[in-house]
Amino acid sequence: MLSISININLAFAAALLGMLMFRSHMMSSLLCLEGMMLSMFILSTLIILNMQFTMSFTMPILLLVFAACEAAIGLALLVMVSNNYGLDYIQNLNLLQC
């Protein structure tokens, strides 16, 4: 169990590092966010199953619902930005541009 949780934590850290390094393109940022949500889902599921805490079995499902909503909103924003500007740069989302 310890090696699995270390691997999941490393996957979360790698996705966070990717989010910090590749923040210029929106698609790569969305993929890193999905990787973070997936590792959080797996880790929370493993913790709940190992502790046998039956009252919170719905927490990973709730996390998946929020991840799906985040992905849908992110993809809609990606389509809108790429249709308006032709690129998926995050700097196109700045409202202070002239």
From Swiss-Prot:
InterPro entries from the UniProt entry: NADH_UbQ_OxRdtase_chain4L/K, NUOK/Mnh_C1-like
EC assignment: 7.1.1.2
Catalytic activity: a ubiquinone + NADH + 5 H(+)(in) = a ubiquinol + NAD(+) + 4 H(+)(out)
Species of provenance: Microcebus ravelobensis (Golden-brown mouse lemur)
Annotated compartments: Mitochondrion inner membrane
Subunit note: Core subunit of respiratory chain NADH dehydrogenase (Complex I) which is composed of 45 different subunits.
First-listed, main subcellular location of the protein, grouped into a coarse class: mitochondrion
Stretches that traverse the bilayer: 2-22, 29-49, 61-81
GO biological process: ATP synthesis coupled electron transport
Single Gene Ontology MF annotation: NADH dehydrogenase (ubiquinone) activity
Record Gene3D superfamilies: 1.10.287.3510
PANTHER family given in the database record: NADH-UBIQUINONE OXIDOREDUCTASE CHAIN 4L, NADH-UBIQUINONE OXIDOREDUCTASE SUBUNIT ND4L
Similarity comment: Belongs to the complex I subunit 4L family.
Keyword line: Electron transport, Membrane, Mitochondrion, Mitochondrion inner membrane, NAD, Respiratory chain, Translocase, Transmembrane, Transmembrane helix, Transport, Ubiquinone
Entry superkingdom: Eukaryota
GO cellular component, one term: mitochondrial inner membrane
Top EC class, one word: translocase
Bilayer topology term: Multi-pass membrane protein
Function, as annotated: Core subunit of the mitochondrial membrane respiratory chain NADH dehydrogenase (Complex I) which catalyzes electron transfer from NADH through the respiratory chain, using ubiquinone as an electron acceptor. Part of the enzyme membrane arm which is embedded in the lipid bilayer and involved in proton translocation.
Name of the protein described by the UniProt record: NADH-ubiquinone oxidoreductase chain 4L
